[in-house]
Amino acid sequence: MHSAYGLGALLSPVNSSSTVGDTLVPGDNKSVGITVLRQEDRRIVPFNKEFQLVEHSKDQVVVKNFLAQLKWMTNAPTLGRFNATAAIDIYYK
């Protein structure tokens, strides 16, 4: 018999990246932002707020895909490279 677990997760900015609402903003180019979406339903994944990653299940393997959506944060974007980093912490529930 397998135990049933769910997974909670927390998405956080790392290094010089910050957030504006549910958008990750690179420290080296604040004119762009990145929103993370669940691929299955295109819902926004919140930053700095725990969310349910996997519902309680007896499945031994679960795959969750995400999308990163780039958006302009200003009407006068700065062209060029940028670096943004986020980490995801996962918790058994």
Regions found by a protein language model. Name each.
Residues M1-K93:
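Mature extracellular/passenger domains of Gram-negative fimbrial/pilin and adhesin proteins
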